[in-house]
Amino acid sequence: MLLKLTKFFMIFLINTTINKFDKNKNRFHCYFENGRDYINRNKKKYDAILSDVFIGENLVLELHSLEAIKRIKESLNPQGIYITNIIGSLSGKYSQNIKNVVKTLKQCFKYIYVFKAQEKNEHQKRQNLIVVAVDQEVHFNIVSYHNINQKRYHQGMIDHVDDIDYTNGRILRDKNLL
């Protein structure tokens, strides 16, 4: 019963989002299935792919392995953007996930940008870390983003981080995930 309620809620949430942000109902697509199965058989090209999947607070490693990232990149248009949400910290006890993901993404994408959702200098606090992977340099205008969304975010809430030491991260591979 819980699974049916969860699936019903997700479908409701997805439909509500599409109705609100995709008025023409032809640009936004959401697939409710095993993500790895989808990217393995996908032949379409997308401008953007967003991944926000977890098992509790843990990564779904099958969608963050080098093999999966290669398939995701093959599913993007040449100037496409891949965005994933990671729960963890930038340093300290909860930082291994972000280090592994950044090191793995660096194998496929030229530029990796990480944004943290907490106040500045909160590198050891567990939080949402938004990772953007692209092949062309991007200059983000965070100030105008905050101005548009004043009611939801305060200045400095989303902060770009460019000093992640991922040297002790490991490249995630399918063969090591078993």
Please name every model-derived segment.
Residues 1-84, 91-98, 106-108:
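The AdoMet/dcAdoMet-binding core of the Class I SAM-like
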Residues 88-92, 119-120:
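Short histidine/acidic/glycine/proline-rich micro-motifs that form metal-
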Residues 100-104, 129:
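Alpha-helical scaffold elements adjacent to nucleotide-binding pockets in ATP/GTP-utilizing enzyme cores
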Residues 111-178:
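Soluble small-group transferase modules, centered on the S-adenosyl donor enzyme superfamily
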